[in-house]
Amino acid sequence: MSSTESAGRTADKSPRQQVDRLLVGLRWRRLEEPLGFIKVLQWLFAIFAFGSCGSYSGETGAMVRCNNEAKDVSSIIVAFGYPFRLHRIQYEMPLCDEESSSKTMHLMGDFSAPAEFFVTLGIFSFFYTMAALVIYLRFHNLYTENKRFPLVDFCVTVSFTFFWLVAAAAWGKGLTDVKGATRPSSLTAAMSVCHGEEAVCSAGATPSMGLANISVLFGFINFFLWAGNCWFVFKETPWHGQGQGQDQDQDQDQGQGPSQESAAEQGAVEKQ
């Protein structure tokens, strides 16, 4: 019994020891520095950005009353969401005649390009920041000794900064178009039955765009985070060291110049 218990204890300790060794090797102080702290914020806000946009869903609608009779009121409810291919979303328009009861209609517009680009960029930002944090915390010596890693990190950071600006602006414009296409007034304007005398149309459910608006805000927050992080990543590159070295050399040359001139003047005075 004692041998089996000891074997079980050693088996339980071995995974814990491996986890402890892994945690001990991490350089947690990197998270207190701007380079690591901003990476954590980028990781979080990337989740907020693609999560709020990719999970959005809303409803729009209208009311159609045939022959001005309350008993013939038809309620139209149209659900839509990411990726906002509205032209594929169907709804039934009631017809106020005896020949047919309804007609299949579609919403107008395809706004999937800016929405999918926004979500895709958020997912790539999530994975890159997670990989960068692993390198910062676990392989910090490799990051500081090998100058290629800071250069690659700087180039990628600049690229993500540009892409976040484009994605946030494009999705903001796309969201404005989505709002215009999903208004109840746009729905009634597209239905021919609402333009005749046989029916009276009114606005129905108005879509709530709060989550979509927040996604645009998260997009611009990501842009500012990546733009601000460019400086801190640049300080890790050899380009920043070269610039400081040149400035120090210029200061030394300027400091030596007047001293040499004063020494020459003193020598001339002594000869006289």
Swiss-Prot record:
<feature type="topological domain" description="Cytoplasmic">
    <location>
        <begin position="235"/>
        <end position="272"/>
    </location>
</feature>
<feature type="transmembrane region" description="Helical">
    <location>
        <begin position="34"/>
        <end position="54"/>
    </location>
</feature>
<dbReference type="GO" id="GO:0007507">
    <property type="term" value="P:heart development"/>
</dbReference>
<feature type="topological domain" description="Cytoplasmic">
    <location>
        <begin position="138"/>
        <end position="150"/>
    </location>
</feature>
<dbReference type="InterPro" id="IPR008253">
    <property type="entry name" value="Marvel"/>
</dbReference>
<keyword id="KW-1133">Transmembrane helix</keyword>
<feature type="topological domain" description="Cytoplasmic">
    <location>
        <begin position="1"/>
        <end position="33"/>
    </location>
</feature>
<dbReference type="GO" id="GO:0021762">
    <property type="term" value="P:substantia nigra development"/>
</dbReference>
<feature type="topological domain" description="Vesicular">
    <location>
        <begin position="55"/>
        <end position="116"/>
    </location>
</feature>
<feature type="region of interest" description="Disordered">
    <location>
        <begin position="240"/>
        <end position="272"/>
    </location>
</feature>
<keyword id="KW-0325">Glycoprotein</keyword>
<dbReference type="GO" id="GO:0030672">
    <property type="term" value="C:synaptic vesicle membrane"/>
</dbReference>
<keyword id="KW-0472">Membrane</keyword>
<feature type="transmembrane region" description="Helical">
    <location>
        <begin position="214"/>
        <end position="234"/>
    </location>
</feature>
<feature type="domain" description="MARVEL">
    <location>
        <begin position="30"/>
        <end position="238"/>
    </location>
</feature>
<feature type="glycosylation site" description="N-linked (GlcNAc...) asparagine">
    <location>
        <position position="213"/>
    </location>
</feature>
<feature type="topological domain" description="Vesicular">
    <location>
        <begin position="172"/>
        <end position="213"/>
    </location>
</feature>
<protein>
    <recommendedName>
        <fullName>Synaptophysin-like protein 2</fullName>
    </recommendedName>
</protein>
<keyword id="KW-0812">Transmembrane</keyword>
<comment type="function">
    <text>Involved in communication between the T-tubular and junctional sarcoplasmic reticulum (SR) membranes.</text>
</comment>
<dbReference type="InterPro" id="IPR001285">
    <property type="entry name" value="Synaptophysin/porin"/>
</dbReference>
<comment type="similarity">
    <text>Belongs to the synaptophysin/synaptobrevin family.</text>
</comment>
<dbReference type="Pfam" id="PF01284">
    <property type="entry name" value="MARVEL"/>
</dbReference>
<dbReference type="GO" id="GO:0006874">
    <property type="term" value="P:intracellular calcium ion homeostasis"/>
</dbReference>
<feature type="transmembrane region" description="Helical">
    <location>
        <begin position="151"/>
        <end position="171"/>
    </location>
</feature>
<feature type="transmembrane region" description="Helical">
    <location>
        <begin position="117"/>
        <end position="137"/>
    </location>
</feature>
<dbReference type="GO" id="GO:0033292">
    <property type="term" value="P:T-tubule organization"/>
</dbReference>
